[in-house]
A protein has these predicted regions:
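Bacterial N-terminal signal peptides
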Residues: 7-15
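Positively charged n-region of N-terminal signal peptides that target proteins for export
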Residues: 1-5
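Carbohydrate-active catalytic/glycan-binding domains of CAZyme proteins
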Residues: 17-20, 33-367
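Ser/Thr/Pro/Gly-rich low-complexity linker/stalk segments immediately outside membranes or between
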Residues: 24-31
């Protein structure tokens, strides 16, 4: 019996050595002129982690200034807009935080190569009468009459979470001069409300019925959530209010996007919403943190059929500090959707100073 087994093993070994090896080839997918849809896996699937946004270069596209400049240590992408074939970035620059900040203008024909438009800021914190410490550009529009609008938020305390409100400034051209409205356009909620301490980081889009603003809001705990407001003229705003909630912290208004469940990567904060209305619905890129201290931040993706009810992507997080070489943190970001390409402009923190990097993804984002 033992001899039979040994003979069988010898035959198998000889067969394996003399059989031709199977060659594995990979055939590239056929080229297509249609945009590739980025789809969400089902709740029961376990997809491999994919890189949604790809950094176009390890180097920043917009650096901070020299040691003696107004933006010598920090710069972020502030408000970014694509208009008449040109990219405009109203970037924030500052030397410390929290400290006075200024807004500079850079432009680009393609989103990749940027040119500074003058050495000096075009809009300053001192131009906003009610800004106590700092003012940060956050969103921009070009109105039907050709006027330009920047929506900004203030930082009014050296403590955390500092009080902040949302304001608006206008100009006849992107270079200014910029004139801030005398009063904020979106104020804090009443004491005890979810946004009683901060309203900040607005993103405003124009729709067929008017304007929609998504913004971050926080109470004294500092835990930020995402709210929504609507307007017919871009000046007077009404916060979204779910009539089913009648007690604080949701008596006056309600967030449309809450923090993630305990233990999730975005369980601490969800903020800095960047929202787009597409043919298939609404898309939001947002920043999340694991705890209320703002640690372990990353960017997430969510979609909605109506701009109010949102579903997180199973691909989250879609961008982290590790995606920028040597970056310890990612702070402020902005996103543009131009011709089926999402341009992600992100403030990367390397060696305790920040510069602006670019990552992109192409194709439709669908539920």
């Amino acid at each position: 019996m033992k001899n039979n087994i040994l003979s069988l093993m010898l035959i198998l070994i000889i067969t394996a050595c003399t059989s031709p090896q199977l060659e594995v080839t990979q055939t590239p997918p056929p080229a297509t002129l249609e945009p590739t849809a980025i789809t969400f896996p089902s709740a029961t699937s376990t997809p491999e982690k994919i890189q949604m946004f790809n950094l176009i270069s390890d180097d920043p596209i917009v650096p901070h200034g020299e040691s003696s400049d107004w933006d010598s240590r920090y710069t972020d992408p502030g408000a970014v807009i694509y208009h008449d074939g040109m990219f405009y970035m109203f970037r924030n620059g500052f030397r410390d935080f929290p400290a006075e900040s200024q807004v500079g203008l850079v432009t680009s024909p393609d989103g990749y190569t940027w040119t500074e438009q003058g050495d000096e800021p075009i809009f300053k914190t001192s131009d906003v009468a009610y800004a106590k410490i700092a003012m940060y550009a956050s969103s921009a529009l070009v109105m039907e009459d050709g006027s330009w609008v920047i929506y900004f938020y203030t930082w009014d305390s050296s403590s955390f979470p500092g009080s902040s409100v949302i304001g608006r400034a206008t100009a006849s051209s992107p270079a200014g001069p910029w004139v801030a409205d005398p009063e904020p356009v979106l104020n804090l909620g009443a004491m005890g409300e979810w946004d009683a301490q901060q309203v900040l980081a607005p993103h405003v889009i124009q729709t067929t019925t008017g304007y929609v603003m998504y913004y971050s809001g926080a109470n004294t705990s500092g835990a930020q959530k995402i709210g929504m407001a609507t307007s017919t003229d871009g000046v007077t705003w009404t916060k979204y209010n779910d009539p089913a909630t009648t007690e604080a912290p949701y008596a006056e208004s309600d967030p449309v996007f809450q923090t993630g469940e305990k233990g999730q990567w975005d369980a601490g904060w969800v903020h800095q919403p960047r929202v787009f209305q597409t043919a298939d619905g609404w898309v939001m890129i947002y920043r999340g943190t694991q705890n209320v201290k703002g640690e372990k931040m990353a960017l997430g993706l969510a979609t909605s059929p109506d701009g109010i009810h949102w579903a997180r992507s199973d691909l989250n997080p879609v961008f982290t500090p590790h995606d920028i070489p040597k970056a310890a943190y990612i702070w402020y970001d902005n996103v543009l959707l131009v011709n089926d390409t999402y341009y992600l402009f992100v403030e990367g923190d390397v060696n305790q100073s920040t510069q602006i990097y670019l990552a992109t993804t192409e194709g439709e984002i669908t539920p």
